A protein has these predicted regions:
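Short flexible coil/turn linkers enriched for glycine and charged/polar residues
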Residues: 81, 135-136, 162, 203, ...
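Short aromatic-glycine motifs in intrinsically disordered, low-complexity regions
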Residues: 192-200
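Short beta-strand micro-motifs in enzyme catalytic cores
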Residues: 85, 166, 219-221, 267
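Short, surface-exposed secondary-structure edge patches
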Residues: 45-49, 222, 261
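C-terminal regulatory/effector modules of DNA-binding transcriptional regulators
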Residues: 189-192, 239
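Pseudouridine synthases involved in rRNA/tRNA modification
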Residues: 1-27, 73-75, 199-206, 213-216, ...
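Short alpha-helix capping/helix-loop boundary micro-motifs
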Residues: 40-45, 217-220, 255
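RNA pseudouridine synthases
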Residues: 1-180, 184-189, 283-297
């Protein structure tokens, strides 16, 4: 792959992370260390300072074969038919294997429970996975059993006709009873593991919210996603000054109220069935960890 530098003085690794689609800064550094990146025909160094017009060439190695092992686990299946299964994912469970985390993911559990009854559109690492929720977010996740179901559900996600509603506890109090955050989200310019509200290299992101109950210093809200960007609710709530309680990435660095994870739960999922179009509406009650925080807030108030 060939790229041309455009910003004077930019580091080679930062340039690659910005310009090469799907490449993080750490991944760019690995390519450089493996000798797969050149600058003007010579091996590049990660801290090389580029000049406009510099020719940067890089090679992405063939992906290594990954053997995803089925793992027996207790899956909370709240809806299932021949085309779709909806899982109520507990907090702490990673959805699919990735670098550094190959085992004990939801996909490992799905392979054990459903075997080859999963769509192959997303490849071997993400069989059946139509959309994702964060590791420390609990709640509903639709899984496609075949390629037809996957294609239709993915289309509903794209045209915003699949409805996803989340319950959240956020820091601070809202004056209004409801509102909308319409702010584009993109990769954080200096921390590639984080997202942020940013105008450049971003995508449209819209979150509608309404107050469920106000407590002293905290608010229970309900969020409806119009789009589905990575970390969207967490980023949007932090952006307006109301980070998710327990979110140590976008909010306070130390847990509050004794809970061990962020208070965010995907409680409602609505979609048109991929085969016949009938409406499917699935609910997942608030998990125990969420209810305990609400009880504590009730006593504090």
């Amino acid at each position: 792959m060939t790229l041309y530098a455009d910003i004077p003085g930019e580091r080679l690794d930062a340039f690659l992370a910005r310009q090469a689609q799907g490449l993080t800064r750490s991944a760019a550094q690995r390519l450089i260390e493996e000798g797969l990146v050149s600058r003007n025909g010579k091996p590049g160094k990660k801290n090389d300072k580029l000049s406009p017009g510099d020719l940067v060439e890089y090679t992405i190695p063939e992906p290594k074969e990954v053997d995803i092992l089925p793992t027996e686990m207790a899956l909370d299946i709240v809806y299932e038919d021949d085309d779709v299964v909806v899982i109520n994912k507990p907090k702490g469970l990673v959805v699919h294997p990735a670098a550094g985390h190959q085992d004990d993911t939801l996909v490992n559990g799905l392979l054990h429970a459903l075997g080859d009854q999963l769509s192959g559109i997303n490849g071997e690492l993400r069989p059946g996975i139509v959309h994702r929720i964060d590791k420390d977010t609990s709640g509903l996740l639709a899984v496609a059993k075949n390629d037809l179901a996957h294609t239709v559900l993915a289309s509903q996600l794209k045209d915003h006709s699949m409805h996803r509603v989340y319950e959240a506890i956020v820091c601070g109090s809202f004056r209004e009873d409801s509102g909308t955050v319409d702010a584009p989200i993109g990769r954080h310019p200096s921390d590639r593991k984080k997202m942020c509200v940013i105008a450049r290299n971003s995508k449209e992101a819209v979150t509608h919210w309404e107050v469920v109950r106000r407590y002293r210093g905290y608010t229970h809200i309900r969020c409806k996603l119009e789009t589905g960007r990575t970390h969207q609710i967490r980023v949007h709530m932090a952006h307006i000054g109301h980070p998710i309680l327990g979110d140590t990435v976008y909010g306070h660095k130390k847990p509050e109220l004794g809970q061990d994870s962020q208070c965010l739960h995907a409680g409602t999922l609505c979609f048109a069935h991929p085969r016949d179009g009938r409406p499917v509406m699935v609910f997942a009650p608030l998990p125990e960890y969420f209810q305990k925080v609400l009880e504590k807030l009730e006593k504090m108030s």
